[in-house]
Amino acid sequence: MVDLESEVPPLPPRYRFRDLLLGDQGWQNDDRVQVEFYMNENTFKERLKLFFIKNQRSSLRIRLFNFSLKLLSCLLYIIRVLLEKPSQGNDWSHIFWVNRSLPLWGLQVSVALISLFETILLGYLSYKGNIWEQILRVPFILEIINAVPFIISIFWPTLRNLFVPVFLNCWLAKHALENMINDLHRAIQRTQSAMFNQVLILISTLLCLIFTCICGIQHLERIGKKLNLFDSLYFCIVTFSTVGFGDVTPETWSSKLFVVAMICVALVVLPIQFEQLAYLWMERQKSGGNYSRHRAQTEKHVVLCVSSLKIDLLMDFLNEFYAHPRLQDYYVVILCPTEMDVQVRRVLQIPMWSQRVIYLQGSALKDQDLLRAKMDNAEACFILSSRCEVDRTSSDHQTILRAWAVKDFAPNCPLYVQILKPENKFHIKFADHVVCEEEFKYAMLALNCICPATSTLITLLVHTSRGQCVCLCCREGQQSPEQWQKTYGRCSGNEVYHIVLEESTFFAEYEGKSFTYASFHAHKKFGVCLVGVRREDNKNILLNPGPRYIMNASDICFYINITKEENSAFKNQDQQRKSNVSRSFYHGPSRLPVHSIIASMGTVAIDLQDTSCRAASGPTLALPSEGGKELRRPSIAPVLEVADTSSIQTCDLLSDQSEDETTPDEETSSNLEYAKGYPPYSPYIGSSPTFCHLLQEKVPFCCLRLDKSCQHNYYEDAKAYGFKNKLIIVAAETAGNGLYNFIVPLRAYYRPKKELNPIVLLLDNPPDMHFLDAICWFPMVYYMVGSIDNLDDLLRCGVTFAANMVVVDKESTMSAEEDYMADAKTIVNVQTLFRLFSSLSIITELTHPANMRFMQFRAKDCYSLALSKLEKKERERGSNLAFMFRLPFAAGRVFSISMLDTLLYQSFVKDYMISITRLLLGLDTIPGSGFLCSMKITEDDLWIRTYARLYQKLCSSTGDVPIGIYRTESQKLTTSESQISISVEEWEDTKDVKDPGHHRSIHRNSTSSDQSDHPLLRRKSMQWARRLSRKGPKHSGKTAEKITQQRLNLYRRSERQELAELVKNRMKHLGLSTVGYDEMNDHQSTLSYILINPSPDTRLELNDVVYLIRPDPLSYLPNSEPSRKNSICNAAVQDSREETQL
């Protein structure tokens, strides 16, 4: 490089001085060469080609001019025929010579000259080296036939009356029309419609055939009948319609031959055109055609993008979307890359859906298909992932690309996206609303373990039910004879609504008052449950911000009610008093119907005597002293307008008192073990930070393995750890990132440390290191590699003393060849667990909600059969929640993530639903926002009596807001139902039993909800006993008595005892203690259900679990020293405040 630089000589001084004055322009201009590009387009031929062919607009004008010219020539031919006088005689000269006036001849010559010149010019411009290709084209030959004779007649005047078949120009006009339509579509930038073109070609072909036949017959009959144009038209229409009256017929052989030729041409050309049209029509039916621009601009529509459309997904979307009155005029455009299956096609042919649903086959990644769906004019776009795929990550990737494509094509279109894996969520943060399936699923299953039936509670809240229907017969469960089904169905109609406080009749009077005061009095007066609020200048929703929050006029209130306030009617005070008097004669558990409370503005008749003049009786719900009890009912402190937080407790009123009795040594050890803070490691990007109970130091990975000893501990089974609380076992296929959201809600900072349950992850596959890094900071979290198929694995992980077992649906089994068979393995495994461990609370996730009828299946249980019939009736009535009366769902024992699809659909109308659901599930934590928890009603709490008094007690003491009740009752069957449960064959088997008491016991046990509860034989034993009973008449009396005795001995050995013995033997074989196995404890003869926002006078019952939204403990600090328990809670809150720096 140095040598090259040394070879360059220095510039002379004069050049240096010139460069200083003029810059570098002087010598650069000397060497610069101007280059012109695209010189090939500057030739005369290329300029003509650009004007006549390439340029869209000029080419369209040329095509239009050519089309008009051909129509003009046909019009001149008709004028010539009409002006011509009929010739005399039948000489053949009339075929070759016609009478043509001079002006008409001049016009036809001019048209011929222009047409021929244009044809030759276009042929020259499109010439590509083969001259015969241009000459032998049919349009060029027709042009020569129709134009050259007129040009020759200019120089040879005797040929001016020569007949020229100018009517053949109609075919040239047809050809020009096709080219013009193509150029028109290019000019207006519109996607060409093959169906439109084909229909146009068919119509123009038919018209050309008829016009050619009319003119040809009329001319050939000049030597015959002398037909005019109208007679020729009549003859052609009659002939082509196959009617053939015969009143007008051709006479000459030439005209007859021409008619035969035209019929042959029609029989060849028209079927081809119809076949192509039919093919395109079928393809159009498959692809769905287009959604017109005019409709998109004048009507409202949303687009649903899916990779494959199943009938269940379609009906869930349509039922939920059109459940809102203001969406009745919307259209749904479905954009799916696959062909419509038979079931979907059948549904979309129903008039109710065919008028509002349009199916387009196409891909969201193609702008052409997005244009067909008019995505840029859509009100919203719903993009759903296909969960029934083996590779769910690949399904998410497709969803991400669809979302990007829609955002690129229509940036102003609101996006509602469903994603499966939480690690993929950050790719679509730009979407307006996102629902991550695994996040919601695991958080909901986790809360099910500490707040029973949370999954059912959330599912009912996000579904649009018919509980608010005016017609009683249309409401869920109102036709059932069971009272619990009526109450449960009516309360299921409660949903979350919003309204501005100053515009509300419910809440306007509470401006300037505390949130808890407004919540209690709104429920007392109107029966609505105020659960959250949002400032006008803030996007964050606060669930139960507590008694320190003062309501403003501009606040947006979120409340639970049967219907929104705008659809409610209010009675005056006199009407309410009359209704209260008439209603006071009934003293049932639910005295006032919900709808009557909603429609009233008066105060509900709640017995709160002496509550306005008495102070709080104590910090808990405990019953006051006996002396006070003898004089009057226990009093409840009133809810203050502006709360005095010195009397507000931040701890659970009904929490375990053992936490108060903790010794100083236990407190010291507890403080050393646990800390409060944010998890230092998150397994995926985009997880919401949650304040949790954490360990001071992370646990070594070897200590996370439950069934393997290491150098730090020597425990090899759950029993050896000596946990004080019962286990929560999660059976999953893999330790995905979503499983992290199962642990976080159970280790949230507001959960008491004494109530933390150990978590055991029973995994089919070993977890990876990233997942272990995330969970090693949480206390009492372990994993074990095993399967629920293996009894030994279940026993090692501590299933015998577990509080809950969560069975997560496996990804590898989510897809099956036959619909609804994806849950087969899960259902059978859970049924085995149900048989082996009847006292275990099992929470199962299924792929298809329809399969929940197989959970805890009892084929001969008449109560389950009655519920099956009720479900069918509700489905026939059009209910969106036909499965809600199934006992496993009502009790919160089964859940399907597809039930939460409606959460995304509801967000189109209620854009706050996703945020509220995430706050309830603990997926998001906002400072000042409360959390979902529960409390159990014990015998000491029954003095409160009603739900309204409980509402007041909670609001006045702790600031908690109750939102519902989880109630458990024993199953009671009527005599008729009991009789149904015994089949004829069983009755024949038991009719020989002489002991009436034993017969009654068998009869009573047969009505139980669990067929395995009473002493029945296994299947083979029953078959053997029946065979003996059928052979009975063949034996003597002594033999019959012997057979009867053998059958009684078999009955005494129950299936439950055999299973219990099997489990105990396996436990002994594994070296496990059998003390924790309670083989006879059974809670399966009960039914549980949820009452969302029950009426204020609903009676509390023993073992009711009340759902609470508790204020954030970190939002305030009490100023006084109430009780010892309260001070402990305040200290915990103070520690939390110091750690979080909030």
UniProtKB/Swiss-Prot annotation:
Stretches assigned to the Extracellular side: 85-101, 159-160, 220-228, 250-256
Positions with biased composition (Polar residues): 1118-1129
Effect of G1032S: Loss of channel inactivation by ATP
Intramembrane segment ranges: 229-249
Pfam families documented for this protein: BK_channel_a, Ion_trans_2, Slo-like_RCK
Residue positions the entry lists as glycosylated: N99
Activity regulation summary: Are normally in a closed state unless activated by an increase in intracellular Na(+) and Cl(-). Inhibited upon stimulation of G-protein coupled receptors, such as CHRM1 and GRM1. There is conflicting data about the effect of ATP on KNCT2 channels activity. Intracellular ATP was initially report to inhibit the channel activity. However, others studies conclude that KNCT2 channels are not inhibited by intracellular ATP.
Biased composition (Basic residues): 1017-1037
GO cellular component term, pick one: plasma membrane
Post-translational modification: Phosphorylated by protein kinase C. Phosphorylation of the C-terminal domain inhibits channel activity.
Bilayer topology: Multi-pass membrane protein
Tissues expressed in: Detected in brain, and at low levels in heart. Detected in brainstem, including auditory neurons such as the medial nucleus of the trapezoid body. Detected in the olfactory bulb, red nucleus, facial nucleus, pontine nucleus, oculomotor nucleus, substantia nigra, deep cerebellar nuclei, vestibular nucleus, and the thalamus. Detected in hippocampal CA1, CA2, and CA3 regions, the dentate gyrus, supraoptic nucleus, hypothalamus, dorsal root ganglion, and cortical layers II, III, and V. Detected in striatum cholinergic interneurons.
Listed SUPFAM superfamilies: NAD(P)-binding Rossmann-fold domains (SSF51735), Voltage-gated potassium channels (SSF81324)
Cytoplasmic side: 1-63, 123-137, 174-198, 278-1142
GO biological process: potassium ion export across plasma membrane; potassium ion transmembrane transport; potassium ion transport
Annotated catalysed reactions: K(+)(in) = K(+)(out)
Keywords, sorted A to Z: Cell membrane, Glycoprotein, Ion channel, Ion transport, Membrane, Phosphoprotein, Potassium, Potassium channel, Potassium transport, Transmembrane, Transmembrane helix, Transport
Subunit structure: Homotetramer. Forms heteromer with KCNT1; heteromeric channels differ from those of homomeric channels in their unitary conductance, kinetic behavior, subcellular localization, and response to activation of protein kinase C.
Function statement: Sodium-activated and chloride-activated potassium channel. Produces rapidly activating outward rectifier K(+) currents. Contributes to regulate neuronal excitability.
Matches recorded under PANTHER family: CALCIUM-ACTIVATED POTASSIUM CHANNEL ALPHA CHAIN, POTASSIUM CHANNEL SUBFAMILY T MEMBER 2
Domain notes: The consensus ATP binding site (1032-GPKHSGKT-1039) seems to be non-functional.
Protein name listed in UniProt: Potassium channel subfamily T member 2
Annotated source species: Rattus norvegicus (Rat)
